[in-house]
């Protein structure tokens, strides 16, 4: 059953204001903090301006690909509720979670069943699992049937070419949260 939504890749104040002040704002709003290849990347100076807004009922999410100490130190004072982390080991995520006292969305990029089964490794360090495609900013899809049968005791979010006009019935059986790209 879908319990929430996330809009990811917000990079301008007008869009952010619209989303936050919408009668049905998303539960999560994501900002791409260190993946410079993305057209939705937001540098620290712009992040400071964007995140000065009243976030209303939404949670702010720092989207981080293999974050290093430099970026983590730069964003630690910003009002992020969650760090969404790609390409880190469970030990690296545990260290980040403990040092920066943030809730963690562990992003697992999915190509096949082997990728799906990696979720077990992160059970002690994640607050939310995100199953995404291998495409990062390319908004590629993955076969959602790969995750239909797994049983996870934490919220499960899916991303990867999910469109606002998709039939949500397709996702209700497998996800608690839908991640829609803001790009």
Please place each PLM-identified region on the residue numbering:
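Conserved N-terminal beta1-alpha1 strand-loop-helix module at the mouth
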Residues: 1-183
């Amino acid at each position: 059953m879908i319990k929430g939504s996330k809009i990811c890749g917000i990079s301008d104040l007008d869009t952010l204001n619209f989303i936050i002040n919408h009668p049905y704002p998303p539960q999560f709003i994501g900002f791409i903090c260190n993946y410079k290849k993305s057209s939705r990347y937001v540098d620290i100076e712009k992040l400071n301006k964007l995140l000065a807004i009243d976030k209303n009922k939404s949670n702010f999410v720092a989207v981080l690909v293999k974050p290093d100490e430099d970026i983590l130190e730069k964003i630690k004072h910003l009002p992020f509720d969650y760090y969404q982390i790609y390409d880190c080991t469970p030990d690296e995520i545990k260290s980040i979670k403990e040092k920066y006292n943030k809730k963690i969305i562990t992003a697992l990029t999915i190509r096949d069943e082997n990728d799906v089964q990696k979720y077990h490794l992160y059970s002690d360090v994640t607050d939310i699992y995100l199953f995404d495609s291998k495409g990062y900013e390319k908004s590629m899809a993955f076969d959602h049937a790969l995750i239909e049968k797994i049983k996870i005791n934490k919220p499960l979010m899916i991303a990867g070419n999910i469109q606002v006009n998709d039939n949500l019935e397709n996702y209700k059986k497998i996800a608690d949260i839908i991640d829609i790209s803001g790009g």
